[in-house]
Amino acid sequence: MTVVKNVNSYDDNYMSQLVPDLRESWAHITNNNGYHDAHKHLNTSWGGIYYVDTGECGEVVDEDGILRMNGTNRFYSPIQYFTLDASMTYLSHDAVDISPENGVLVIFPAYLLHSATPYIGKTDRVVISFNSITNQKT
């Protein structure tokens, strides 16, 4: 809730009226060569991923000798068009990869298109995901 407060410049009084509401959660176990296609979470405000066991995620060199990221979560930019103006080069990236780390929680807007890139490993990659909304106290 601290992020919500700071990003929106809400005062303590307003924040005291907000209550996070966990709508659903599930475990996702990714085996060797598993992945999760790009998707969004509908009818919710926030999505989250908690990395329980990242298995063998990280940088790997594939059989062709190419360095790639293994088992990352990819978040796609909601900005469809951008300018090449030097002050806005950060907008030119169409996706950001988050490299999983055990015990880390990632929270993101549910409308953000995201995926789990292919995972290659002998041990499973285990995450707990959830959807939530923010309600106002009654």
PLM regions: where:
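Extracellular and organelle-lumenal recognition/adhesion modules and their flexible linkers in secreted
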Residues: 114, 119, 126
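Catalytic core of non-heme Fe(II) oxygenases with the double-stranded beta-helix
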Residues: 21-107, 124
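Histidine-centered metal-chelating micro-motifs
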Residues: 35, 111-115
